Amino acid sequence: ISGPLRIVGPRSTFQPVLWRLIDEFCGQYPGIVPEIQLEDRVGNWVEDRVDVGFRLGLSPHEGVIARRLFAVQLIICAAPDYLRARGAPGSVAALQSHRCSVFRNPGTGQIVPWRLKSGNDEVQQPVVPAICTNDEMLELNAVLAGRVLGQLAGLTAAPYIRAKQLVPLLVDHIPDRYS
């Protein structure tokens, strides 16, 4: 197998895992030349001649063959500085009195509601935004700086949680998956 392999995916969510996958694949197939486009907009994969695409959520276009690879959890996180200054929310209702980030989907322009587990159900939880952005890395940096709480993709948050730069909050309300 040789030749170009056109790969697309969201810029920030998949960066922590994508390189390892590409590196391993190209190690097995050295004739492959990966052409990687990381961006948060969802283009037309057929017109763009995409071979492999990664996305969170539903298939971006009718006629695209999609497979669920893995579930992504959404985790409410805060930096230790935020918690020292403002404390941790003790309940979902307490989120209303905290500074929260919200993410605006770059493809639709809509604010993505926070998703939380309530019993056996998943609910959308409105929060009062202290910052709104369409860039996951900017949102991550605002959370790391201790300015806001954020609901971040587990792939994004995990290395910072392990390094104790972020603290997961309301863990009983983490939805089972966002995929």
Where are these regions (language model features)?
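Central regulatory/effector-binding core of bacterial HTH transcription factors
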Residues: S2-I65
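C-terminal regulatory
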Residues: N44-E47, S59-S179
